Amino acid sequence: MKINNFIYIFLAAYLATFFRLTLNNNFFISIIGSFLVGFFVSKRLSYSNEKILFSGFFSCFTSFSGFIYFLYKILNQGDWIKFIIFFNLIIILNLLTMIFGFWISRKIT
């Protein structure tokens, strides 16, 4: 991988972090990120563009640790029912949103 690609990945990660801090809502960020991942997966990007977008932007924007921390806070309150509901809801909604993004991308191209 060329040095330029590393710079682009860094810039994409920086931009994603800025958006994540600006939005400041893990659930909303997760849904938007899943939709966009689904949308861009169908685009068949070049290897370097794929790395920039998925490794740089989306890995910082949709940070899995934000999702885990949210679930940890619920679990720490001892509310197992709420934990199970949110865990399943987040997984299912994100998967469906990604599929929807993929479908939309295919329909408009």
From Swiss-Prot:
Keyword terms, alphabetized: Cell inner membrane, Cell membrane, Ion channel, Ion transport, Membrane, Transmembrane, Transmembrane helix, Transport
InterPro entries with a match to the protein in the record: FluC (IPR003691)
UniProt topology in membrane: Multi-pass membrane protein
Cell location: Cell inner membrane
Coiled-coil segments on the chain, per record: none
Pfam families: CRCB (PF02537)
Protein name: Fluoride-specific ion channel FluC
Cellular component GO terms, alphabetical: plasma membrane
Keyword Nucleus included in the entry's annotation: no
A biological-process GO annotation: monoatomic ion transmembrane transport
Catalysis: reaction(s): fluoride(in) = fluoride(out)
Record's function text: Fluoride-specific ion channel. Important for reducing fluoride concentration in the cell, thus reducing its toxicity.
